[in-house]
Amino acid sequence: MQNSKYCEKKIHIALFGNPIEHSLSPLIHKNFSKEIKINYNYNSFLCTKSNFFVIVKNFFQNGGFGCNITVPFKKKSFQISNKNTKYVKISNSVNVLKKSSNNNIIGYNTDGIGLIYDLNRLKYITENSFILILGSGGAVYSIVYHLLKKKCCIFILNRTISKSCILVNKFKKFGKIFVFDKNLYTKKFDIIINATSCGLYNFSPKFPKNLIFPNTKCYDISYSKNKKLTPFLSTCRDLGSRKYSDGLGMLVAQAAYSCYIWFNILPNIKKNINLLKSII
């Protein structure tokens, strides 16, 4: 039986980003729609920097109910929302938008809780974990706060040091976060997270290869299809890591929390991770 609160008409949800042709989000939300018995469609829109704002605003003006934002527009979408949650105000990064009953566009971010869910599922993270994050873009802004809430000690490695410094200065009041430097080349990190978009273009980010040990947990927030490793994870495996995972679990978890924001129903995350793995 369809959820009576949303049975009047089909609900329009969307994904905005670039690139998007690889995205599994439409498939995930198709499964969610069946599970929670709410009839919503989920369409993808390829955007450019010049038309992103226009396309998203047109979507909401023409009956759009909610949307996800992916790379490279998570920081830009902060400028679209006219109301934001506390965490979004901290991170200045949005991956979920929802139109409220009084026509406000409210910004949320589910990347951080999605990542923590998956790192807990994999048993990768504990309080006080030493974590190296590769990258300093919108995806990193989305996840750092939740890692600091776990009392993790974070180091940021990015090819542009000034961007790392800006990020660190923004979040240092919430916990231990530092810019990676050459004095850490022999440091043993508990987790190394690739939060760059390099995998979308089929290459691994550059990082000191001597940081990989057999027990180093390597995590890529990107994911790959057909059970192939992402370029980053392939590199880590070849360097000797025995523990590595892509971000498929994070993707499903953040999507489920997005669904909860839109419809106040949380799909079964574990079941949908297993379902997706069996399909792709």
From Swiss-Prot:
GO CC terms, sorted: cytosol
Positions with a binding annotation for NADP(+): 135-139, 158-163, 221, 247
Keywords: Amino-acid biosynthesis, Aromatic amino acid biosynthesis, NADP, Oxidoreductase
Catalytic residues (UniProt): 74 (proton acceptor)
Catalytic activity of the protein: shikimate + NADP(+) = 3-dehydroshikimate + NADPH + H(+)
Residues annotated to bind shikimate: 23-25, 70, 95, 111, 223
Alphabetical list of CDD domains matching this protein: NAD_bind_Shikimate_DH
Assembly notes: Homodimer.
Protein name per Swiss-Prot or TrEMBL: Shikimate dehydrogenase (NADP(+))
Gene symbol of the encoding locus: aroE
